[in-house]
């Protein structure tokens, strides 16, 4: 598949989705002004009410798409409860979108530790100081907590909190969308029955 075919939207010859996603993400990294790895994460609460928020993709391979968070946050609690989630990437500069959904699994402690240690020191302090998604009485209270944990971890490495780790979304469907004139867009969806199954490709009406 040539770069020109991808740019014009003629990407329907792809036999599996992960290589195609990797190519699109690399092009987004060259064209998007901010955060080409930004993605909308959708979950549902115990009442079935949906929630969506922007997060950052921190890795992907044939096992799935990985993001990290506080497990006590709203998204963390909801993914732990349902073990399902959906993602939507939109790269406006490229006029492309990728949607996927599937079951969720927790990454290994080794993966979580490695990523946590790669974060800036201030971000690691923040993981301890922020009671994510819970009411905050004032900005001062947050800054005070940051100062306390900064002093506590003034020397040495900052360990990963037990409540902070990563989720891997193992897609059962991945849809690639490319804008075309007159709203006659190209849509190709890859589907499978299980997270380890083979892919079936379907071209969709726009």
From Swiss-Prot:
Assigned protein family: Belongs to the pyridoxamine 5'-phosphate oxidase family.
Enzyme class label: oxidoreductase
Catalytic activity: pyridoxamine 5'-phosphate + O2 + H2O = pyridoxal 5'-phosphate + H2O2 + NH4(+); pyridoxine 5'-phosphate + O2 = pyridoxal 5'-phosphate + H2O2
Residues holding FMN: 53-58, 68-69, 75, 97, 132-133, 177, 187
Record's subunit section: Homodimer.
Gene Ontology molecular function terms on file: FMN binding; pyridoxamine phosphate oxidase activity
Native organism taxonomy: Bacteria, Pseudomonadati, Pseudomonadota, Alphaproteobacteria, Hyphomicrobiales
Gene: pdxH
EC number: 1.4.3.5
Binding site for substrate: 58, 115, 119, 123, 183-185
Pathway where this protein functions: Cofactor metabolism; pyridoxal 5'-phosphate salvage; pyridoxal 5'-phosphate from pyridoxamine 5'-phosphate: step 1/1; Cofactor metabolism; pyridoxal 5'-phosphate salvage; pyridoxal 5'-phosphate from pyridoxine 5'-phosphate: step 1/1
Keyword Oxidoreductase applies: yes
Function: Catalyzes the oxidation of either pyridoxine 5'-phosphate (PNP) or pyridoxamine 5'-phosphate (PMP) into pyridoxal 5'-phosphate (PLP).
PANTHER family (UniProt xref): PYRIDOXINE-5'-PHOSPHATE OXIDASE, PYRIDOXINE-5-PHOSPHATE OXIDASE
Binding note for cofactor: Binds 1 FMN per subunit.
Protein name: Pyridoxine/pyridoxamine 5'-phosphate oxidase
Listed GO biological process terms: pyridoxine biosynthetic process
Keywords: Flavoprotein, FMN, Oxidoreductase, Pyridoxine biosynthesis
């Amino acid at each position: 598949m040539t770069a020109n075919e991808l740019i014009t939207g003629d990407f329907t010859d792809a036999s599996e989705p992960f290589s195609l996603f990797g190519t699109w993400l690399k092009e987004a990294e060259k064209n998007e002004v901010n955060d080409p790895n930004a993605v909308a994460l959708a979950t549902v609460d115990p009442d079935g009410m949906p929630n969506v928020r922007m997060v950052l993709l921190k890795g992907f391979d044939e096992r799935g798409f990985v993001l990290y968070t506080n497990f006590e946050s709203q998204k963390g609690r909801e993914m732990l409860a349902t073990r399902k989630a959906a993602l939507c990437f939109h790269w406006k500069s490229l006029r492309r979108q990728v949607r996927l959904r599937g079951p969720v699994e927790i990454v290994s402690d080794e993966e979580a530790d490695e990523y946590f240690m790669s974060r800036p020191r201030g971000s690691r302090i923040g993981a301890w100081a922020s009671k994510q998604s819970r009411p905050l009485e004032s900005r001062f209270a947050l800054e005070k907590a940051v100062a306390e944990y900064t002093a506590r971890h003034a020397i040495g490495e900052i360990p990963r909190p037990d409540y902070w780790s990563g989720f891997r979304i193992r897609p059962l469907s991945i849809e690639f969308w490319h804008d075309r004139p007159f709203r006659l867009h190209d849509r190709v969806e890859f589907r499978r029955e299980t997270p380890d199954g083979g892919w079936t490709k379907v071209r969709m009406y726009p």
